[in-house]
From Swiss-Prot:
<dbReference type="InterPro" id="IPR049261">
    <property type="entry name" value="RecA-like_C"/>
</dbReference>
<keyword id="KW-0547">Nucleotide-binding</keyword>
<dbReference type="GO" id="GO:0003697">
    <property type="term" value="F:single-stranded DNA binding"/>
</dbReference>
<dbReference type="GO" id="GO:0009432">
    <property type="term" value="P:SOS response"/>
</dbReference>
<dbReference type="InterPro" id="IPR013765">
    <property type="entry name" value="DNA_recomb/repair_RecA"/>
</dbReference>
<dbReference type="Pfam" id="PF21096">
    <property type="entry name" value="RecA_C"/>
</dbReference>
<keyword id="KW-0234">DNA repair</keyword>
<keyword id="KW-0742">SOS response</keyword>
<dbReference type="InterPro" id="IPR003593">
    <property type="entry name" value="AAA+_ATPase"/>
</dbReference>
<dbReference type="GO" id="GO:0006310">
    <property type="term" value="P:DNA recombination"/>
</dbReference>
<keyword id="KW-0238">DNA-binding</keyword>
<dbReference type="GO" id="GO:0016887">
    <property type="term" value="F:ATP hydrolysis activity"/>
</dbReference>
<feature type="binding site">
    <location>
        <begin position="69"/>
        <end position="76"/>
    </location>
    <ligand>
        <name>ATP</name>
    </ligand>
</feature>
<dbReference type="InterPro" id="IPR049428">
    <property type="entry name" value="RecA-like_N"/>
</dbReference>
<comment type="function">
    <text>Can catalyze the hydrolysis of ATP in the presence of single-stranded DNA, the ATP-dependent uptake of single-stranded DNA by duplex DNA, and the ATP-dependent hybridization of homologous single-stranded DNAs. It interacts with LexA causing its activation and leading to its autocatalytic cleavage.</text>
</comment>
<dbReference type="GO" id="GO:0005524">
    <property type="term" value="F:ATP binding"/>
</dbReference>
<keyword id="KW-0227">DNA damage</keyword>
Amino acid sequence: MAINTDTSGKQKALTMVLNQIERSFGKGAIMRLGDATRMRVETISTGALTLDLALGGGLPKGRVIEIYGPESSGKTTVALHAIAEVQKEGGIAAFVDAEHALDPTYASALGVDIQNLLVSQPDTGESALEIVDQLVRSAAVDIVVIDSVAALVPRAEIEGDMGDAHVGLQARLMSQALRKITGNIGKSGCTVIFINQLRQKIGVTYGSPETTTGGNALKFYASVRLDIRRIQTLKKGTDEFGNRVKVKVAKNKVAPPFRIAEFDIIFGKGVSTLGCLVDLAEETGILLRKGAWYSYNGDNISQGRDNAIKYLEEKPEFAEQIKQQVREKLDKGAVVSANSVAKANEEDEEDVDLDEEE
């Protein structure tokens, strides 16, 4: 078959077909990638510098994000920090509290403007996802958090008798809703965060027996999946004051995946931003540690990590100076644990078959 080499004729035909598509489907239905300025992905900070680094800058705007892990691992805390960051920039946030467990006092302590936070506590999964879809389509809301997928109970299950079998109902509900919501998210630029719980597969011999609720659709549609785990309890003497958590970027469509970040979550206060800063400053060589002592430019500033964090709390100008130097080092390509890629496991690379739940 001969190839048409008439460049001007091809360009004229291309212009005509592009105009026809735009008339039929609306402006922006098709575009050159170089012209699509909104394709440059903007991000939302998670409140943890190490996690932002592992994500390639933060949570991407206008995408579906899944945060999953065991109970009390910090899933809701990370989502509330993202809401606080959006509100600081003047954005509007919504929280769909399907678990009926939102603590306004704790949210306020994390920096969330609870007076202007939109909150919904729907009775059924259908209601919750319809509310999410309407908020997304309005293009007036910048971030929506759903807590959690496991609590999105289908209407048939609520209205049915205890003990009735409802096989695959929630998976089908999530699959239908995500097909509808995802297209609207792309047009409105709203970020949607689904918080999810873990369950155990029965009879698994090889690989991880853990799986998330709601079927496979969310795994497929999510641009970012964060696996968050508690790895250590922080104590002062016998008193527990927080958790050390590890977050693995199990999936990332906008930056390299499989990176791992660690940070502290302090009870009643949320993510320890200065704790992240101390860790990154040590890894980049800005703060040197010899034994238990931390030093800066040859001068000892504190003994122990907790005292180093306290020192930065008392000297915000010095903390900002350290932060700027850390950013400069990272911009020049400094390699730290949060921006190096961890080895993928079998679960991360599993194929997702949506046909199973249709």
